[in-house]
Amino acid sequence: GFTFIVDKKKLVQDLLEVRILLEPSIASMAAVHADDEDIKKITALCDEVEDLLKKHEDHTQKDIDFHAAIALSSKNVVVPRLVPVINSSIPLFVETTRGTLLEETIETHREIADAIAAHDPLRAQDAMYLHLVYNRKQIQMIKKDSE
């Protein structure tokens, strides 16, 4: 794990770089391979994250579940082994951005879920990339403000 890494700001940035490399492609694979059950699960988790965000309640676990469901829907045997890296980064991102990406998270999660449901790999890839870029931009702004 990443428990012993002292520089949390560097860790957040590095995890985000790795997620930007991996997750858009994972979303694309999920759009190609997701079956009806996968799509139901992804859509339900998207709804749950949105509901929690709108109530200003902790959405971290459901957010983790959403990204994990997408990874499993890729049907790639290696991807689930990457999920712990993605999962460990989400609480750090939520903590770092302090809920400032409420609308962006709702919109991009919905776009990712819709693209996967439509079996549109390019749209899913773009939506996931946009989701992560919003996070990166917000984290960079927070880093700048704290310097």
List each model region and its residues.
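Generic C-terminal helix-cap and adjacent flexible tail
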Residues: 137-147
